[in-house]
């Protein structure tokens, strides 16, 4: 699967959140998957992402948004860039009370766990994943979206809290430890 399809896939999956206005404030009704997607209605999605001044990364985000908006002209995506994940976290936490949190953000699972301490702040994605039309691999998607079986189960499990999924693992960092065997044996 081409990497450029990941961000639009994430955006369209999570764009459904705006159909019910569920994007992170305390006391909102619990999220439910809409029966249909009204393409005549205008929607605006705020997408928060980390960028540490990497122009290539910004260009990829902008191209993904442009491509997505060409497919879904009734959805406007507002990109908000941050220099580190901590700033995204602080902004989301601060804006929960004012109902101005983003619809979509790239964040860590432990940050999501903190957001979940509020009532209906983060929408569970299981219903969206399973939606035959707009879910993972959905028939009505206007792009080649990933199917559930194309996502590594262990990565997806890290996005689960109390039996529900709250994130999509389209981006992963791999940590490794390299050891110089010669130096270790010399110790």
Task: Tell me what each language-model feature is.
Residues 49-52, 167-172, 180, 187:
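Short beta-strand->loop
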Residues 57, 185-187:
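Extracytoplasmic/periplasmic substrate-binding proteins
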Residues 110-176:
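Hinge/lid segment of periplasmic solute-binding proteins
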Residues 1-5:
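Positively charged n-region of N-terminal signal peptides that target proteins for export
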Residues 111, 182-183:
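Short, well-ordered alpha-helical scaffold segment located
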Residues 10-18:
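Bacterial N-terminal signal peptides
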Residues 22-121, 131, 136-141, 145:
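Conserved N-terminal structural module of periplasmic/extracytoplasmic solute-binding proteins
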Residues 18, 70, 185:
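Short polybasic/polar patches that bind polyanions
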């Amino acid at each position: 699967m081409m990497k450029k399809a990941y961000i639009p896939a994430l955006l369209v999956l999570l764009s459904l959140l705006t159909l019910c206005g569920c994007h992170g404030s305390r006391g909102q009704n619990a999220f439910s998957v809409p029966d249909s997607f009204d393409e005549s209605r205008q929607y605006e999605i705020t997408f928060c992402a980390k960028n540490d001044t990497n122009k290539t990364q910004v260009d990829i985000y902008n191209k993904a948004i442009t491509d997505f908006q060409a497919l879904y002209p009734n959805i406007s995506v507002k990109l908000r860039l941050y220099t580190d994940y901590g700033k995204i976290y602080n902004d989301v936490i601060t804006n929960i009370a004012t109902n101005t949190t983003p619809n979509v953000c790239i964040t860590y699972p432990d940050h999501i766990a903190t957001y979940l301490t509020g009532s209906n702040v983060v929408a569970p994605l299981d219903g969206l994943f399973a939606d035959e039309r707009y879910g993972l691999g959905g028939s009505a998607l206007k792009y080649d979206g990933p199917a559930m079986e194309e996502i590594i189960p262990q990565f997806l499990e890290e996005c689960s809290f109390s039996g529900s999924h709250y994130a999509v693992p389209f981006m992963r960092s791999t940590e490794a430890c390299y050891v110089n065997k010669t130096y270790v044996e010399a110790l």
